[in-house]
Amino acid sequence: ETSSTTLAFALYELALQTKLQERLRQEIEATIKKHNNEFTYECMEDMHYMKQVLAETQCKYPIAPNLMRQAAADYVVPGHPNYVIKKGMMVTIPTIGIHYDPATYPEPDKFDPERLSADALRLRDSVDWL
């Protein structure tokens, strides 16, 4: 169910932006040709733009809008010493709040696979994409 939901949203976004759709189609055709016209695991791993499209889809339409985590140790909230997350306390992490933060992802409503390119990922904290 989660895979089909992600693929449905990816296809929806690609239908809205035919230039992205064409770029992905060209990558798929070129990569399959490079792998002797065989669609294998290695072939799929070579589709870097495909990974970006799927990652951006998951960023814009997260399957889990919130993540529940348990604090491993006491944590004093920076700048607020009276607020302490006690060890063992359950914490809700708002996935969609992080993914839609314009400080991290400019124009968060825009579908832009380039924001998840290898170069862009190196400039961002690894916890900014859940």
Show which residues each predicted segment covers.
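Cytochrome P450 catalytic-core helices
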Residues: 2-19, 23-27
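Amphipathic, well-packed alpha-helical segments that form the structural scaffold of globular domains
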Residues: 8, 25, 29, 55-62
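Long, K/E/R/D-enriched contiguous segments that form extended
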Residues: 9, 35-38
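A generic secondary-structure signal for well-formed alpha-helical elements
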Residues: 14-19, 28, 32-35, 61, ...
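Conserved cytochrome P450 K-helix E-x-x-R motif and the immediately C-terminal K′/meander segment
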Residues: 38-83, 102
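Conserved cytochrome P450 K-helix/beta-meander segment immediately N-terminal to the heme-binding cysteine loop
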Residues: 61, 93-123
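Cytochrome P450 heme-thiolate "Cys pocket" and heme-binding signature region
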Residues: 81, 118-130
